[in-house]
Design a protein with these regions (language model features):
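Hydrophobic alpha-helical membrane-insertion signals
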Residues: 1-31
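A ubiquitous short alpha-helical element
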Residues: 2-5, 51-55, 461-464
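Peripheral, non-cofactor segments flanking catalytic/redox cores
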Residues: 9, 94-102
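Short secondary-structure transition/capping motifs
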Residues: 22, 55-60, 72-76, 96, ...
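Basic, short loop/linker segments at the boundary and entry of helix-turn-helix/winged-helix-like folds
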Residues: 26-72, 444
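A short secondary-structure junction motif
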Residues: 39-44, 90, 94, 483
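Anion-binding and metal-coordination hotspots
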Residues: 68, 76-89, 100-524
Length: 524
């Protein structure tokens, strides 16, 4: 029988080549990665690792960092077990780790303890190296956000408004309890003051005073069936329970903070949001994080993780983060209709940023001619020679008053106008929905901003930017979620989640860089 295999070497006999690099192709991703990392000083982030006097010598921290980053580059998201396994069987990881095989616990300690406070600076240094090599244009920034489901149980919500309602009901119970106690201790001349609201320290002080007044011994309290509690014991237990419950409500409201209305019990940093991918099929809120990215020439230039459910509140923090990283604001931030608000437009004007963010009614204003030319819209009303606004029936609208818009940080005001007389108007059914004279709200400043945005985005430059935003910003999330299978947050806590998202962003940029280098060398 003819031999179809080589039999001149075996597992007990060494053979050439002796170096792993000789087994790799010149265009191999790990060699491209190694050349890029060679131009970055990684040692400065790894000098403060604590020294241990017992146990084995530590692994080379630079090799550990390269291995972690390369794992996220190749897999999108690389678990600790995958890193451990790759170091044992994958020749590329063997090359980076010099044949050493750290355990998953070692990788976990290195990521969670060593890289926690340094990962953002590492992300920025890698970006600077890539951007200088690729001549990335940072003046055009394509912004998008996506909600990633948190690693939290689904039915563990805490609602801020419900907690506040329960707290006020508890105040009423405390007041009723104190009034009952006052009636029983009237003989002593002691009166406990009732308040509209209470704090736990005040209740603890009341309990201490009652213990002294009644000379209570908690060791003599009775429990269980067949035993009757005294009035003093009942009042003591009620006040103690109220104090614990009040402390719980205060803690829940503090965790929510002023900028969100819910959180999860298993991940206090996660906020309940409505996610597009409703796999439960009941339109239910799920614990999630709002991940914001700014993309420049297909690379993630800036990334942020927020509690906010709306993208409008995420624009300014993302721009400030961009300036903190690169020293300037982008000239042309391009975003969808979720970012176009009065606050964001004013921020752009104050910092010399062009307005290329759509507003919520942008599509209807530009695509729906019937809506845009509707004669019953206040913005389409005629202005006569005296500057008075007149409706299609030629009735004058008189100024009523100005009012502040709630939740606006720049003091935005709306002007309210009322029609002089709508009785007998032939257009009443089309113009208004009530029997009263029609009133309209107008903000000329915001209307002029919307017109400026339309002119910017409808220009040739604006059309190209809109097209590029759909390709680059939304395409980046598409690659992360569907091509590289990162669809859900793994870690818990806002700091750990930011660490994880930054690692995924670094992996994406390295992946893009390697793909572009491969295409260029193949074409050459």
């Amino acid at each position: 029988m003819k031999t179809l295999h080589n039999n001149y070497c075996n597992s007990k006999q060494g053979y050439l080549p002796l170096f792993l690099s000789d087994c790799l192709d010149l265009l191999d991703p790990v060699l491209t990665f190694e050349r890029l990392m060679g131009g970055i000083d990684l040692n400065k982030y790894l000098t403060d690792i604590p020294e241990y006097t017992t146990g084995r010598l530590r692994y080379n921290p630079v090799n550990m960092l390269k291995t972690v980053l390369f794992g996220f580059m190749t897999s999108g998201y690389c678990s600790l077990r995958e890193l451990e396994d790759n170091c044992k069987v994958n020749i590329r990881f063997m090359y980076l780790m010099d044949h050493q095989t750290p355990s998953y616990r070692t990788f976990g300690y290195f990521i969670n303890e060593i890289l926690q406070d340094k990962i953002e600076n590492i992300f920025n240094d890698i970006n600077h190296a890539i951007f200088n090599d690729e001549h990335v244009d940072l003046q055009h920034l394509y912004i998008d956000g996506s909600k990633f489901e948190a690693n939290a149980n689904k039915y563990t919500w805490v609602w801020k408004k419900a907690t506040e309602k329960f707290r006020y009901k508890l105040y009423e119970k405390i007041t009723a309890e104190i009034e009952e106690i006052n009636a029983e201790i009237a003989w002593s001349g002691v009166q406990i003051t009732t308040n509209p609201e209470y704090v736990p320290d005040y209740l603890n002080e009341i309990v201490e005073q009652l213990v002294l007044l009644w000379e209570l011994d908690t060791s003599t309290f009775v429990y269980g069936s067949g035993k009757r509690k005294s009035k003093e014991q009942r009042h003591y237990e009620h006040l103690t329970t109220f104090c614990q419950k009040l402390q719980e409500y205060i803690q829940k409201i503090e965790i929510c903070g002023p900028n969100r209305n819910s959180y999860s019990k298993t991940d206090n940093s996660a906020t309940f949001m409505r996610i597009k991918t409703d796999y439960m099929g009941n339109d239910q809120l799920l614990p999630a994080y709002n991940v914001q990215i700014g993309v420049a020439d297909e690379y993630i230039a800036v990334v942020d993780v927020n509690h906010y459910r709306s993208d409008m509140d995420c624009f300014v923090p993302l721009m400030e983060h961009f300036k903190q990283t690169y020293g300037f604001y982008p000239k042309y931030p391009v975003a969808d209709a979720g970012y176009g608000s009065y606050n964001n437009y004013i921020f752009c004007e104050q910092n010399g940023i062009e307005k290329y963010m759509k507003f919520p009614m942008f599509k209807k204003e530009t695509k729906d001619r019937k809506y845009h030319e509707d004669p019953f819209r206040a913005v389409n009303f005629r202005i006569d020679e005296q500057g008075v606004m007149r409706c299609p029936n030629d009735k004058a609208f008189h100024f009523l008053y100005r009012k502040n818009v709630r939740g606006n940080q720049y003091g935005r005001k709306e002007e309210l106008y009322e029609c002089e007389d709508c009785s007998g108007c032939p257009y009443a059914e089309k113009c208004k929905k009530t029997d009263k004279n029609r009133t309209v709200r107008i903000n000329q400043e915001l209307t002029s901003m919307h017109q400026e945005v339309i002119e910017n985005l409808e220009s040739i430059h604006g059309a190209l930017l809109r097209m590029n935003r759909s390709i680059q910003a939304e395409g980046t999330f598409g690659i992360m979620k569907n091509d590289r299978w990162y669809k859900r947050i793994v870690r818990r806590g806002i700091h750990s989640v930011k660490l994880e998202v930054l690692l995924v962003a670094i992996g994406h940029n390295l992946y893009k860089y390697q793909k572009k280098k491969m295409r260029n060398r193949t074409a050459a």
